[in-house]
Amino acid sequence: MFVAREWFRHRVGSFNEFSMRYAKASDEFYIPAPEDVRSQVGKPGAYSFEPVEPELAEQTREELQAVYDAAYETYNRLVEQGVARELARLVMPMGAYTEFYWTVNARSLMNFVSLRAAETAQREIRRYAEACERFLGEKMPVTHSAFVDNGRVAP
């Protein structure tokens, strides 16, 4: 969910997200790879990320898993007790995976890619932006070529 929330901030195109209000929540959650657990150094807007010690990375991963397990167990218990899904979903953590459809024009897609595939973008959303760029290159090769030739800046 945390990547989707960053994505939705672009306010371009239209989004249709899977709703835990009407369907059972998934039991899939984001656990970063050990090398993706990092510390933030510096001030907001002007910071960098540094790797953490392997022990801290593993501890972080274990704690995330424990929180996810507890939250999903609570969610299921509430639903089984008759609590409406729209209320039970409130216990779901930001690391829960979500699904959505995105309808977007080429110009807005290029803008998204130029911002979110940059080295300064959050690593997790950068991976999705890179996938969007591959899609752009496959479906609109001439447009993608012009995008790259123009310094990866949307017109």
Which residues are covered by each model-predicted region?
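Family-specific signature for flavin-dependent thymidylate synthase
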Residues: 1-155
